[in-house]
């Protein structure tokens, strides 16, 4: 699936834009603040319902406007799909697919699997466990049809259980929540564990190509003690949870631990090496999805040249081309991306929110 056309209205500093896109590489070139990252963010928002630079909707809607509007056309092997997203200052969204309203953002996300690589993306490696849980859950969402419903129910039940912990005095009073919670926890943890095991070799192989000087290992931690049933953990930790007023163990505490030569990567790798590792993980995840489902990701890469020397940029470019996926790349100068260009690529110039090709 590739995005063949993108219409943007009142998004960030872009008043209006109508872009015909390449199914291969699309380059967005312009000075800092020109709006090139806003194009990437518009694509991301169309597939996620939210921007990646700010959660405050007022900062995403163009100044003095009431809403942004995004439309796109997706070309699959057999059919074309029209999609749209409108969001106003109150945060209310309207999702349209093939001319009909009433759809959910999750449907857009399923239609447009994306991998995002930005200068802020180091949080996958040096941020908290929630970023690595999101990495795992992205894959579970795209590979397991029941994941989104299970994950939504898990969040709801954990919120209810945590509220109940402020009121109950005996564990028996929590059993109604735990009876529903336990099978969801076991299913989600199983999906995460199976995915982690399945992609481990792919991640190791890709990382070896990008960072041959390190031995990288990946280990999934499910969020509670190994070999212990979750039901037992909940009951045994009731008093502690009640004092904390939240559930201290479970899949909401899971992590994917990444080590280089036995030490945490954030303590071992330079910024340039961390970016290479981030790129390797995103590529491995996208390639794994293609192999397992036949679906290809869209790759969004902001500030392509930052932190990478010529050799590493060339390696990343060759790996991206090998995916045969649609790729969007922003850069300050065309010189940074000219070697990646071919007869099927499109080069866009961005200046003060105006986009030309």
Curated annotation (Swiss-Prot):
What keywords tag this UniProt record? ATP-binding, Cytoplasm, DNA damage, DNA repair, DNA replication, DNA-binding, Nucleotide-binding, SOS response
UniProt GO MF annotations: ATP binding; single-stranded DNA binding
Amino acids binding ATP: 30-37
Q: Which PANTHER family match?
A: DNA REPLICATION AND REPAIR PROTEIN RECF (PTHR32182:SF0)
Q: Which family would the database say this protein is a member of?
A: Belongs to the RecF family.
Q: Specify the superkingdom.
A: Bacteria
One matching Pfam family = SMC_N
- For this entry, the protein name equals DNA replication and repair protein RecF
Q: Where in the cell is it found?
A: Cytoplasm
Record-level GO cellular component terms: cytoplasm
Q: Name one GO biological process term.
A: double-strand break repair
* Role noted for this protein: The RecF protein is involved in DNA metabolism; it is required for DNA replication and normal SOS inducibility. RecF binds preferentially to single-stranded, linear DNA. It also seems to bind ATP.
């Amino acid at each position: 699936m590739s995005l063949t056309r993108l219409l943007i209205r009142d998004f960030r500093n872009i008043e209006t834009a109508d872009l015909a896109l390449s199914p291969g590489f699309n380059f967005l070139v312009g000075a800092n603040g020109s709006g090139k990252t806003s194009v990437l963010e518009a694509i991301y928002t169309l597939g996620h319902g939210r921007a990646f630079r700010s959660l405050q909707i007022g900062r995403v809607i163009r100044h003095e406007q009431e809403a942004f509007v995004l439309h796109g056309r997706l070309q699959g092997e057999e059919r074309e799909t029209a999609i749209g997203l409108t969001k106003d200052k109150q945060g209310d969204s309207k999702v349209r697919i093939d001319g009909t309203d009433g759809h959910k953002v999750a449907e857009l996300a399923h239609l447009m699997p994306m991998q995002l690589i930005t200068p802020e993306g180091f949080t996958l490696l040096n941020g908290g466990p929630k970023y690595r849980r999101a990495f795992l859950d992205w894959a579970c969402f795209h590979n397991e049809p029941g994941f989104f419903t299970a994950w939504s129910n898990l969040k709801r039940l954990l919120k209810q259980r945590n509220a109940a912990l402020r009121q109950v005095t005996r564990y028996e009073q929590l059993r109604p929540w735990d009876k529903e919670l336990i099978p969801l926890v076991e299913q989600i943890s199983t999906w995460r564990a199976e995915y982690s095991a399945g992609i481990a070799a792919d991640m190791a192989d890709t990382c070896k190509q990008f960072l041959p000087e390190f031995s990288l290992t990946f280990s999934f931690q499910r969020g509670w003690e190994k070999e212990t049933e979750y039901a037992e953990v909940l009951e045994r930790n009731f008093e502690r949870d009640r004092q904390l007023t939240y559930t201290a163990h479970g899949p909401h505490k899971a992590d994917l631990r990444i080590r280089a030569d036995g030490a945490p990567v954030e303590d071992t790798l330079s910024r340039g090496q961390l970016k290479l590792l981030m790129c390797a993980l995103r590529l491995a995840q996208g390639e794994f999805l293609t192999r397992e489902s036949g679906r290809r990701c869209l790759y969004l890469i902001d500030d392509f040249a930052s932190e990478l020397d010529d050799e590493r940029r060339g390696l990343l470019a060759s790996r991206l081309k090998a995916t045969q996926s649609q790729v969007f790349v922003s850069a300050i100068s065309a010189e940074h991306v000219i070697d990646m260009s071919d007869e099927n690529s499109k080069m866009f110039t961005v200046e003060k929110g105006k986009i030309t090709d």
